[in-house]
């Protein structure tokens, strides 16, 4: 199959049940579009063979994803109908199914939209769980507080709105306006989904406009729904190739300027500060003509805004001379490194696209803050006598240059980093380091990605200080395919060096069941007299025993990241506490004057137990009923079905509150 535009490696052949042949043939076109592979059903050697052979050709990653998709389609391990707010239904049907294709590429699950608010998911266990998690993430983002995000002072509004609107330009359909009305948090997650697909060779190649993709992705065949097709950079239906459009660019530009001036001078609706933008009207498709259409007049009214006068012909804004505006402000260049510019790490910047409308002016205090900021900005750019609020188009253009957290994280990953642990002896007087891998990875990933590089940076830091006893705890399911994990090869290397330990987890009925990894960390710190590296406070574990409370209070080391720089405080316990070097060293134990007088191991353990009992009696006396019930529940979680033994130990040790000592006492019983 040579129609896919890339050199195909050795074809991958595998067998599936013959009963699923009809399903496979029905999904063949969609599978080839989503995963950008070629698929063929090989002829049967024997008509009675219960299996059929399928052949996939394409890039290795695409073939692996498509193979997992087909296996889940033919023999699904999990299948369920999930429900979500109907407002999100436009995601799965809008943009000609583009976001649904990106979700299928990311998870390799078979997705079928049903009635508004329901989605059928089927596939292998891992694919099903990933798809369910992505939908839950969209639902969670929909419930976020959106009032602050509508403020023009919010840092990411302009970039996210502009990129999302530009993404929909060549995919307009009946759901475009509903997509544009989604909260910015949901739009940002969809952009992240598209970016994830673009790192491979997934559905993001179906962009029909050359202005949204880098040159290396232009010229790729990209079929759309209902037979509509874009080939290369030529827009179907426009009748113009890029060369023709380039020759007529000057003429069209002059015509658009004249039309804009004529429209502004005609009897259009008065423009006032009370009016807000209608989302989705300002971004119309370029399929029909090749040039950006004019921005539609403003609709709707808000309360509490001062009216801005309009002057016929000259179109002046209050407080500014009529000559201060260009006749048409609808097309603004993209000056920042936006998310869509960097989708495929292209070397060339995209051409100009329409600038998004400004966000509606919020009530106090956002309005006053923006008004003060605009005065300061205009003081550097306009005449000294110019007062007032300034042009809303100019504010929208300036807001479009703001970066997003996802973009900043991707830029940080561009800097090369290699985990290099020198094979030299360490310092024996240093404490064991216990690293909260999930906490470190999420902090470095800006709470959005699981950054394996963050864990590697932390290990490198302590290794360079001379520590050799280092343990990183990470849930086992992070080793499986997870869209949020970045640079997982660092985890593989640390695991091969016995520096990383996996806490148990499993999947049951499509839900992930994980062990509480915080317990592993505190328990290991207790046994090794180690330091826990985490920004978590472990409040729920501090009440379980006095020893654990002392560990959490005295042996917890917080951290932070400045880009790719891992940093810890020089005074972990405050200004009056020990320095970092003293904090990381093992405590010095005083030895007796004669080694022959050292007690035996058995007598030492008995003395320690007796001291613990005496301490319990002196600290709190006999346990309260509530404490006993709590300890009984915790013990039964471990010693299931041994109610009589648990009750016996609790009655025999009325002063003990340490769950570990009670567990040891249970294990020592012989009946």
Curated annotation (Swiss-Prot):
The modification Phosphoserine is found at residue 355. It comes from the Eukaryota. Residues 430-582 form the RNase NYN domain. Pfam families: KH_N4BP1_1st (PF23050), KH_N4BP1_2nd (PF23052), RNase_Zc3h12a (PF11977), UBA_N4BP1_C (PF23054). Residues 591-612 have a biased composition (Polar residues). Residues 250-272, 367-381 have a biased composition (Basic and acidic residues). Residues 351-365 have a biased composition (Pro residues). Keywords: Phosphoprotein. Gene3D superfamilies: 3.40.50.11980. Residues 234-274, 294-327, 344-402, 577-626 are annotated as: Disordered. Belongs to the N4BP1 family. This is Protein KHNYN. It comes from Mus musculus. The lineage of its organism: Eukaryota, Metazoa, Chordata, Craniata, Vertebrata.
